[in-house]
Amino acid sequence: MNKIGLTLLLVWLAVRAIAADYSYERNVLYRGNAGDEYTSKMCRLDIAYQPDVQNAPVVVWFHGGGLTGGSREIPSGLLTDGMVVVGVEYRLSPHVETMEIVDDAAAAVAWVFDNIGKYGGDTSSIYIAGHSAGGYLVDMVGLDKKQLARYGKDA
């Protein structure tokens, strides 16, 4: 049992050491023309990056919550050496319809394509991922090309 505890401690310390090398840009508006207060409040993202790393792969992370709850996060497990991680917040039901939430996800991914280079991210190596409702948004944006086409992206 003692070995398990020691192993967990070492893993935790390693993750903390890697995470300590990261800088964060928080509360970034990804809808330039937000329009209303709710959209401006919700359509935000956080970026974790390593300032001295260039051409890093990028993970765009969508939180779960059944499209009715949850908030943006950057999972510590994704903070591996040389990766940029973007945690996305989006509007929630019942304030907006489901397809508006999908559009928020597409707008966030388009913003990443346009801006992630400033944070050392490689636009040819962007991956989208999510948990639960976030996984649904990943599917909707990733499998339906017209979602990103609205933002001039062919991905």
Regions inferred by a protein language model and the residue ranges of each:
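Sec-dependent signal peptide recognition
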Residues: N2-L10
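Hydrophobic h-region of N-terminal signal peptides that target proteins for export
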Residues: L9-A19
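N-terminal cap/lid segment of alpha/beta-hydrolase-fold proteins
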Residues: A19-V53
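Short beta-strand element of the alpha/beta-hydrolase
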Residues: N55-G64
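Alpha/beta-hydrolase fold active-site loops
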Residues: P57, M83, S125
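Short beta-to-alpha linker loops that shape the active-site pocket of alpha/beta-hydrolase fold enzymes
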Residues: G65, E89-V96
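Short amphipathic alpha-helix adjacent to the substrate-entry channel of hydrolases
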Residues: S71-V88
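Primarily recognizes the serine-hydrolase "nucleophile elbow" in alpha/beta-hydrolase
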Residues: A110-A155
